């Protein structure tokens, strides 16, 4: 099953699109989605994609976006299922002062495989991108993340940031990260940071001294990473569906 989607945000518009790819837990098959987005001057687009397909699914997800002057594109990606998932995203920040904000959360288990390739092309002046990746690897899961920030000639004053936080729950997981920062302009800044591994020993000791077992600490920290991405989804009904699948209950909300 292959689908194509085109989103055209007119000048000054504000659009939120939610795509929830799901199936029965035991389902198998192949699915592919290509999403192309144009964000006109002063427009805003938020794309939320949630992948919770069955254990036998191979899924291909491709996103291509182009931003014009002072436009903003934001994407929230949650990968929670599927046997093999291939995620690709390319954003051309063409217009001056345009921005990209990407939040990715993934939870991989068994022998699930996730291959991600995210590209931010800084073309216009004073463009900005922020790519934030949070993930949990269990059992014998395999993850590859490629993140490229391309600061091109003419993109004066551009700023690109990329941050990854990966919690390794078991000894047999495979984690691969390939950050790339390309620079063809002087007055620009590109940064990459990563926290990969197990929980800090001092924190683990502190929580264990408060009565938690090591397994409970790891489960709590794993949940916190994914929850932080889920909470960014603006649609409460979508958040509830994801929380019900992961935790068996809806999102807990607290009144001010």
Roles of regions detected by a PLM:
Residues 1-212, 228-256:
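Conserved beta-strand/loop scaffold segments within soluble protein domains that form the structured core
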């Amino acid at each position: 099953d292959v689908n194509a989607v085109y989103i055209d945000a007119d000048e000054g518009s504000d659009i939120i699109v939610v795509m929830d790819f799901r199936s029965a837990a035991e389902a198998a098959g192949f699915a592919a989605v290509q999403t192309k987005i144009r964000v006109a001057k002063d427009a805003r687009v938020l794309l939320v994609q949630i992948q919770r397909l069955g254990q036998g699914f191979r899924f291909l997800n491709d996103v291509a976006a182009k931003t014009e002057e002072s436009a903003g594109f934001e994407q929230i990606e949650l990968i929670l299922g599927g046997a093999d998932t291939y995620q690709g995203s390319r954003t051309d920040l063409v217009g001056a002062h345009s921005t990209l904000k990407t939040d990715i959360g993934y939870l991989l288990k068994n022998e699930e495989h996730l291959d991600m390739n995210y590209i931010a092309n800084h073309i216009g002046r004073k463009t900005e991108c922020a790519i934030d990746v949070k993930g949990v690897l269990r059992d014998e899961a395999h993850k590859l993340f490629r993140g490229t920030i391309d600061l091109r000639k003419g993109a004066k004053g551009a700023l690109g940031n990329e941050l990854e936080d990966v919690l390794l729950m078991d000894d047999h997981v495979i984690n691969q990260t390939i950050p790339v920062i390309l620079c063809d302009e002087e007055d620009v800044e590109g940064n990459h940071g990563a926290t990969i591994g197990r929980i800090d020993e001092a924190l683990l000791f502190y929580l264990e001294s408060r009565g938690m077992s090591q397994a409970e600490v790891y489960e709590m920290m794993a949940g916190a990473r994914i929850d932080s991405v889920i909470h960014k989804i603006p649609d409460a009904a979508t958040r509830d569906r994801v929380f019900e699948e992961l935790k068996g209950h809806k999102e807990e909300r607290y009144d001010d």
